[in-house]
Amino acid sequence: MANNLIVMTWNVENLFPPEDTDTAAADTYTAKLTYLAGLIVGTGADVVALQEIGSLRAAQDLQAALGEPWQAVVSSHPDSRGIRVAVLARHPLTEEAQILALPPSGLPAVPDVDGDTLTHMGRGALQVHVDCGGVGLRLLTAHLKSKLLTYPGGRRYPLNEDERARGAGYALLRRTAEAVALRVHLNKALAAAAVNGQPGMPTILCGDLNDGPDAITTVLLEGPADGDVNRPDKGDAVRLYNLGRRLPPARAYSRIYQGNGELIDHILATRDLQLQLITIDSLVDDITSIGASTRSRKQTVVPDHAPVIARFNGQRNQPV
């Protein structure tokens, strides 16, 4: 691993290339690419996990704005709106897995609002290997089901309060099934790489998990609980730590919704990386409060989420 490794996760809010005839949208898109690239370069980030990339072209445009030697890997599994996850890095990148199916060993029998059984995540997750020195870094990024509710037939409004309650329950069930699918995938990957009961490959899971650090859908991604990170135990090989718990209290949020800060963008890491963490921050200075309506956001350059960024001391490559 490099002497210092800087990892960022950022929901860049509907980064879609404009239609050829929409000059206003083209100007906004160009300004947004300039803003995104400037902030990424300014932080010195080595690896950036992105959510709400609107197309392969959007990822390529951001890669071009960053310039050499940046590389990109993009998920092949967007949601119905076309948004997907991607990873950009200024080190060699290798795609390792596109994660989509809800596995039999997870929660394979979860219903959706129309009474069908879910078989896959709404937006595919992505696993890459970053060749950043030493054994490198395994990174997974995901964008779990949002709190936005939908109802039978695609309606955005309930017919009654019972249906509203069911809609909220279905959204939570989907997010839970997606989180379990990620954890099942991680269980296998982490266990296979373990060395002497410790992580054999530094691993990060990051992205927009659409709930807070204490929500069960976030906590279950950590794996077995840990009483003391400084004392090795049998759970170390598969455990992740939510680094957001070490954010400065005044900046422990990544989005402002109706005036309230909430931390829904997370970086989880294996024990070796937790012990090598130097700083973590949420770059909240530019974001503003948003509401339920998205119409006013169409011409906005600054995304509604703040990037969360972690800096690691990479000089120690072996687990403690």
Enumerate the language-model features and the residues they cover.
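Structured beta-strand-rich core segments of catalytic domains in phosphoester-bond hydrolases
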Residues: V47, E52-K147
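Metal-dependent phosphoester-hydrolase catalytic domains
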Residues: T94-I99, T119-M121, H129, V184-I204, ...
